[in-house]
Structures are given as structure tokens and as C-alpha cells.
């Protein structure tokens, strides 16, 4: 991934359950708060230090899971700011499609008000 200012990217509010793992077989739950194409803001009750790289898994569409590695870049109470540090082509396409659908849904909601 290219180095860039993550705040310059559009963040899409999302509420979706996911799971994190530190590489062992134990997964623990998390909740996506928002995301961009290069990072995800997550809520978790686990204390995870900045710099740690975790496996992430989330079902974006029925039987279609995003699986990638996230690096913790900042921690604020129960929220973890992460950047995607490893993702395959399938995951990139799935993430892009999911973000496009979420963004379109948010735009439709604003137009209806």
C-alpha cells in the first residue's frame, strides 16, 4: 500500500460485526464503526497496543467475507484505528464493492430526508 494521509480519504459509517485474531486460533468479536479503502475504525473491549498486526474477518455479503491483516495505528478508549496492511485481490474488490454500496445507501438516505 502507498503511504498517504488516511484522513484525506472518505470514511463511510458502517455498523457491522467482525472478528479479530492475533494469529492464534482464538478470535474475539469487534464492531466496525467506519471504514475507508485503506483503514477501518473498530470498537473492541480488548486492549491492543499500537503497532500490533491482527487478522480480521467480516461477512460483508452473504457468504462473502473480507479477510485481511490490520495494523493498529491509534487507540482511543474502546476504539481502534487501523490500516489495512495485507489484503488479496479478492478482498480488495469485495471491500470496494461494499464501500460503494454503503456510500450509495447513505446518499439515498440523505436525499429522502
Regions found by a protein language model. Give the residues of each.
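Short, surface-exposed secondary-structure edge patches
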Residues: 9, 43-48
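Short beta-strand-centered aromatic/proline hotspots
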Residues: 29-31, 67-73
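Short, conserved beta-turn/loop elements at beta-strand boundaries and strand-helix junctions
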Residues: 23, 37-38, 75-80
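N-terminal helix initiation/capping motif
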Residues: 1-35, 100-113
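C-terminal output/interaction extensions
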Residues: 80-113
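A residue-level detector for short acidic-glycine micro-motifs
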Residues: 34, 72-76, 86
